Curated annotation (Swiss-Prot):
Active site, renumbered: 26, 103
Pfam families: DHquinase_II (PF01220)
Superkingdom of this protein's organism: Bacteria
Signal peptide (UniProt feature, chain positions): none
Protein name listed in UniProt: 3-dehydroquinate dehydratase
Task performed by this protein: Catalyzes a trans-dehydration via an enolate intermediate.
Species assigned in the record: Enterobacter sp. (strain 638)
GO terms, molecular function: 3-dehydroquinate dehydratase activity
């Protein structure tokens, strides 16, 4: 592949607390450790990877808007915004960038309010319950799909 693909990784609220926050559900890796591993993998795949985490919905929306015309694919763990944010859904629709929704835990095996996602039906794919490996699987899938379409 001649040109680098540009992939944006977005992480929502409370994911900055990974490593200490309910490790039995979310694992013991910190968000920095997950992103560092993913960055190493991205380099080996000739991918430019950017990461952004925020506990603020508007900041995630602003970053999605900034991605228009510069990002080829988005990997997003919307965390609690999965179940509440029509605004993030609308932002993703507005920029028309394909994305994969990621969840560390199996949201379908948890409380009923976590079973609904405002993003899943418009996502290129959804990965849940595979822990930090889900980010790697999402990256590999995004690169494969981008390679097939370019």
């Amino acid at each position: 592949m001649a040109d680098k693909f540009h992939i944006l990784v977005l992480n929502g609220p409370n994911l900055n607390m990974l490593g200490t926050r309910e490790p039995e559900k979310y694992g013991s890796l910190t968000l920095s450790e997950i992103v560092n591993r993913l960055s190493t993998e991205a380099t080996s795949l000739n991918v430019e990877l950017d990461h952004f985490q925020s506990n603020a919905e508007y900041a995630i929306i602003d970053r999605i808007h900034q991605a228009k015309d510069t990002v080829d694919y988005i990997l997003i763990n919307p965390a609690a915004f999965t179940h509440t944010s029509v605004a993030i859904r609308d932002a993703l629709l507005a920029v028309s960038i394909p994305f994969i929704e990621i969840h560390l835990s199996n949201v379908h095996a948890r409380e009923p309010f976590r079973h609904h996602s405002y993003l899943s039906d418009i996502a290129a794919g959804v990965i849940c319950g595979l822990g930090a490996d889900g980010y790697s699987y999402a990256l590999q899938t995004a690169v494969k799909r981008l390679s097939q379409s370019h």
